[in-house]
């Protein structure tokens, strides 16, 4: 997720299991542990310049960097792999790989054996990190946000990105597609307007997406392509920044430019709120879809002017779950919620003020 810099933050991303997040900044890179919140390390401006995108591979020493911001050291058309475990006094010694393209890189996703690089109209997949070679490339619909998700599971190598048709998603099983071939990916017609946000659950069995309208989140089975459930964020259009599943796929959270983080139940959808009209009985076709939608079981607010990413924290007990929201204004919010919809703030911090003198 990227936004105009506030306090110098150019983009924020969780790692694959949401136990860490990385922060690309005008002043370099910072890596944080989520629970407990603490800085794991940083790369300063002298080492990497201003950075537009940073992704980390699980909790390892490998980072993918893309230049950006006002004083970049690296190009916006290149992805550089930084290996902090490499010995060397010069920062060049730690740059172990480089992937260069003809157009700006908009997103990077990594798993233990592959790296996915997203341009505005094309997606490249390489073997990674040992002796990388190009495995696939896919042409896409115009994708200015660089939307894409990659399943981290050992069992499933699923890639999802916007399809050629407006509002559609393309799913590619990288394990069963032969490198160098352009086998047709499976397509899901998810929305009527362009896709604005997409996310896979941890095992890659469910995909969630929202359109530019941002009022509904739809979930589909990645195997059967059937729609599983439709969740209503609200009635006013909104830009969704982030959608994430809980680790066991029991819940889903979503953040938007309305400054609200919504939490939905997936395992037991009876916990979600319904429209009051649903209890009235028969309604006209115009509002039937509105009535059938499920509304969030809980929600909380963050500063509306500040984009944020959200994810689920570690469960503290069977009936208490937590959601973390991390904003580009430098704030960290942790809320706990119960199945009956109670939601209370448990922690607030300013992660940009947490400093560790250690380099990454």
From Swiss-Prot:
Q: Which UniProt keywords apply?
A: Autophagy, Cytoplasm, Lipid-binding, Repeat, WD repeat
Q: Where is this motif: L/FRRG motif?
A: 231-234
Q: Which Gene Ontology MF annotations are present?
A: phosphatidylinositol phosphate binding; phosphatidylinositol-3-phosphate binding; protein kinase binding
Q: Which InterPro entries match?
A: PROPPIN, WD40/YVTN_repeat-like_dom_sf, WD40_repeat_dom_sf, WD40_rpt
Give the subcellular location.
Preautophagosomal structure; Cytoplasm
Any notes on this protein's domains?
The L/FRRG motif is required for recruitment to PtdIns3P.
Record's protein name: WD repeat domain phosphoinositide-interacting protein 4
